[in-house]
């Protein structure tokens, strides 16, 4: 009579090592047929849709290399070049051991770091200089560019002095200079408005003076025409012969021509202080 087979015993039967045929003889005494040359070794698992047959030409790809299971000896070694490049130039060595005697296999990964302080200290690498890399590299490049912009701002604010490295001091200087420039711009704008108003008033005065000049010029031409018409003699004009006058008469106003005039009375005659004696009033 055969012994009873529990679930653990059956699972151990299914997880046998095919490379060692000696284990098959241990279970033949119980009447269990475990021949591997049959077409369907596990009919119970096939009914559940599980395929446990190994394809001879099946090739798996791990990273940049390909693994041929037909010639696989159980140990997989990865070269350091196949491991992704790390920020701190970490050389990784991974060793994967697959045990075919177990159901899922065991995977073992070993990593060796050349620099233990790499995770704590951020060193300058070549990947950061090319603009790529991790978030730490991008953040470092951003800070470097920001520091350069602050240095340029400090040199622009104070050209003759050494650029400052204190960012709050640079920002304070920039705010102060901007406020000063804003006040100067407002003052210049007010001055410009005043000058524009003065220019408008001067233009109005200029137009008024131009009109007055035209009026005066017209009056001058009119006066000249009148003078020319008064002084110009007519074609049939005969000069008047002055009348005879006494030689002791002289002209008072030369412009009036020589007209007979009496001499001035002497001072003794014009004295009226003794008129009562010399010339008594008529009775």
Swiss-Prot record:
Pfam family, one: HLH
Domain of life, per lineage: Eukaryota
Principal subcellular localisation of the protein: nucleus
Domain bHLH: 130-181
Statement: the UniProt record of this protein carries the keyword Nucleus: yes
Any single Gene Ontology cellular-component annotation: nucleus
Renumbered residue ranges of the record's region Disordered: 96-134
Keyword line: DNA-binding, Nucleus, Transcription, Transcription regulation
Biased composition (Basic and acidic residues): 107-120
PROSITE patterns per the UniProt record, alphabetical: BHLH
InterPro entries registered for this protein in UniProt: bHLH_dom, HLH_DNA-bd_sf, ILR3-like
Gene Ontology molecular function: DNA binding; DNA-binding transcription factor activity; protein dimerization activity
Localization (cell): Nucleus
SUPFAM superfamilies attached to this UniProt entry: HLH, helix-loop-helix DNA-binding domain
Subunit annotation: Homodimer. Interacts with BTS and BHLH47/PYE.
Protein name as it appears in the record: Transcription factor bHLH104
